[in-house]
Amino acid sequence: MGNNFQFIEVKRVDPAKVKAESRLKNFDEIYGKFDTSLAKEQADRCLACGNPYCEWKCPVHNYIPDWLKLVAEDRIFEAAELSHKTNSLPEICGRVCPQDRLCEGSCTLEDGFGAVTIGSVEKYISDTAFAQGWRPDLSKVEATGKKVAIIGAGPAGLGCADVLTRSGVQAIVFDKYPEIGGLLTFGIPGFKLEKSVVENRRKVMEEMGVEFKLNTEIGKDIPFQSLLDEYDAVFLGMGTYKYMKGGFPGEDLPGVHEALPYLISNTNEVMNYKIEGDSYVDMKDQRVIVLGGGDTAMDCNRTAVRQNAEKVICAYRRDEENMPGSKREVANAKEEGVEFLFNRQPIEIVGNGKVEGLKVVTTELGEPDEKGRRRPVAVEGSEEVIPADAVIVAFGFQPSPSSWFSDFNINVDDWGRVVAPESKTETSQFMYQSSNPKVFAGGDMVRGSDLVVTAVYEGRQAAEGILDYLEV
């Protein structure tokens, strides 16, 4: 790159952010975009480390220093081509990845100078290239005559479809929802990811040759057996939608909401999607408590304030430092008026026929658990009741295996996750192959609830396993 001391002379600059009082009026993305000049300047801050920790920390192992260099040289189409070699959804990951604990958190410049704005540049690459007419080059791809059914149009399914299509295998993607994306569309609010971004990705993939069959639920609208009969292989990428309960009294009271149905209902309302059985949950003028400290909890907090809730409180059982979600999202929630109660363990949702409050106990952090995080320990005599009209439970998600899995020898573990090893075993000859040799799986329904980018990675890896299975 041009100037060896660019990282000193040019400070880290993030895209402009809409002021809190303005962004609360809608569900639009809150971050702006780099113009060409600023993108080049920020990309040129990269040190091009010999051992790039950013690349290692990225779950898909993006060629980050290489495409930063291309952006700095204004070679945007080449940067787009390179970013798509490792990531099927770079414009989406650039928006929703927690870069502060992945690539940017591993940047050599993070301490003292400010990490390179990797996520914002990643978003800039695809947004700009698409706007200028760039599309993935499949001119040298030869059709193999093979076709694969993919169940689930979320990150894992899209990642799988991308790799298969680039290898000459016809990918047909089934999804029960009216639009692709899975939780990208229906779970992640528009202020983090505008739905037009996902809609554009659908157009790009359809131009590549991917076929989408939406509003189609396998096992209900189409029997799974027909997929086994008509396709050379099947990939399962249905994600995790079942919420994890807290196990305390009062969870069944009216006014207690699961995080995901709440977020989905809001997206359906904003986008005017008509989904059978869905009803809009409006928090206007209500006192809302959100339980949890991850990104989904922040999505619920920030959605409720946009619905004009009277007050939104986020209660978390550990301290702020131990919150599992993105620090950026916590900061955004605070700016938007969300109150935080740290070291509060919920023990009961109280009320007579409806939610009236949340009983919590203050905690202190004790010895580390098996994951190295210090356990919350209740402080004796510290119970209190926080008044509330609604409680949103955002403790995470787990897979809910389809009832027909056992009929087709698709094994799951004790947590309901499909058993599909990431490497060859005695029972699985190919990557991400299930106990049914013709069926592969990846993403959250294999690893449990995780990041968008890890689901993309596993979908892509599963596609490689399918290609080996098909001898393509």
Regions found by a protein language model. Name each.
Residues 125-142, 203-220, 243-307, 414-429:
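Glycine-rich dinucleotide-binding loop and its adjacent helix/turn
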Residues 35, 207-228, 276-280, 343-389:
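A structured beta-alpha segment of the ubiquitous adenosine-cofactor-binding alpha/beta core
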Residues 23-41, 63-95, 112-141, 267-270:
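Ferredoxin-type iron-sulfur electron-transfer modules in oxidoreductases and energy-metabolism complexes
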Residues 5-32, 61-73, 82-84, 111, ...:
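Beta1-alpha1 glycine-rich phosphate/pyrophosphate-binding loop at the start
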